[in-house]
From Swiss-Prot:
Sections of the chain in a coiled coil: 232-290
Alphabetical UniProt keywords: Coiled coil
Organism from which the protein derives: Arabidopsis thaliana
Keyword Manganese: no
Pfam families, per the entry: MATH_2 (PF22486)
SUPFAM superfamilies xrefs: TRAF domain-like
Name assigned to this protein: MATH domain and coiled-coil domain-containing protein At3g58360
Keyword Coiled coil: yes
InterPro entries: MATH-CC_domain_protein, MATH/TRAF_dom, TRAF-like
Every MATH domain range: 6-131
Length: 298
């Protein structure tokens, strides 16, 4: 396969300081037709330093001869100062003996967890990686024709298209509790519910005249499904109710306008009929006032 352009992946780890697991994995993502994931030791790996790896996802199921050559840059983001962010850039061969690379073992955890350090903002640690797949030996996880479509980024545990990340980040900033009660762990289900949420928002961003009753009815069904899954979207429900009320007013107004228009047309026709009748009456009155002719007598 040919060289793949570098792909930027973002992984936001919530409540980093409160994690009790020895190690945690990101959801898998696809770059260059290959599945990858991040591995991090939030409490260190027997030492008080952050360990962060880029790993080939599901490598145990691959054929023994698989190999992947990649250049990657792992960046632990300082959200207050870019200059203080910690980066590790390498170019490595991944294989059955070395399915993961990229430790940041010289990064003290006490520096990450320090108050106002900039690495934890609202308890969230942000990791950004740039990955460039240089060569793949063995079968691709995803064909090159579809890999560009399926490449995704992890944000708050949700797999998103790169084009969706900024919008979703803004949504979480404006509504930080939106997924606080969302408990599903399966990445496909998480992605599905997030897609449903974004589709509902996109629908409600249309003007009321572009929506019909079926759209709104399906919107309520989608909203029920989203809230049942644990999303807190009271603000979205208010918007749906507001749009429904506007749509009802619009339809009621259009119905009344049609009735008034029909009544007006009827009145116009009556006016025309009355004008015609008036002209006829005028003609008869004029004829009645005319002197009689005696030509038929004399």
């Amino acid at each position: 396969m040919g060289k793949q352009l570098a792909k930027k992946i973002t992984w936001a780890i919530e409540n980093f300081s409160s994690l009790h697991s020895k190690k945690i994995y990101s959801d898998p993502f696809i770059v260059g037709g290959c599945k990858w994931r991040f591995l991090v030791y939030p409490k260190g790996n027997n030492v008080d330093y952050l360990f962060l790896y880029l790993e080939v996802a599901d490598y145990e199921s691959l054929s023994p001869e698989w190999r992947r050559h990649a250049r990657y840059l792992l960046n632990v983001v300082n959200q207050n100062s870019v200059k203080r962010s910690k980066q590790n850039e390498e170019q490595k061969w991944f294989d059955v003996q070395s399915p993961r690379w990229g430790r940041l073992s010289m990064f003290p955890l006490n520096e990450i967890n320090a108050k106002d350090s900039g690495f934890l903002v609202n308890g969230e640690l942000k990791i950004v990686a740039e990955i460039e797949v240089l060569e793949v030996i063995g079968k691709l996880d995803v064909s090159e024709e579809t890999s560009t479509i399926m490449e995704s980024m992890d944000f708050n545990g949700f797999q998103l298209l790169p084009s969706q990340v900024d919008f979703v980040r803004h949504m979480f900033e404006k509504h930080p509790e939106i997924a606080s009660e969302f408990r599903l762990k399966n990445p496909n289900l998480r992605a599905g519910y997030m897609s449903l949420l974004l589709s509902l928002i996109e629908t409600l961003r249309q003007s009321p005249q572009e929506l019909n009753k079926v759209d709104l009815a399906e919107g309520y069904v989608a909203l029920r499904s989203i809230t049942d899954a644990g999303f807190k979207v009271d603000w979205l429900e208010k918007k749906l109710v507001e749009i429904s009320e506007k749509k009802n007013k619009e339809e009621a107004g259009e119905t009344r306008m049609q009735e008034i228009n029909e009544e007006l047309e009827s009145l116009k026709q009556k006016c025309l009929d009355l004008e015609a009748q008036l002209e006829k009456e005028k003609a008869e009155v004029f004829a009645a006032k005319s002197p009689l002719s005696f030509n038929d007598v004399f």
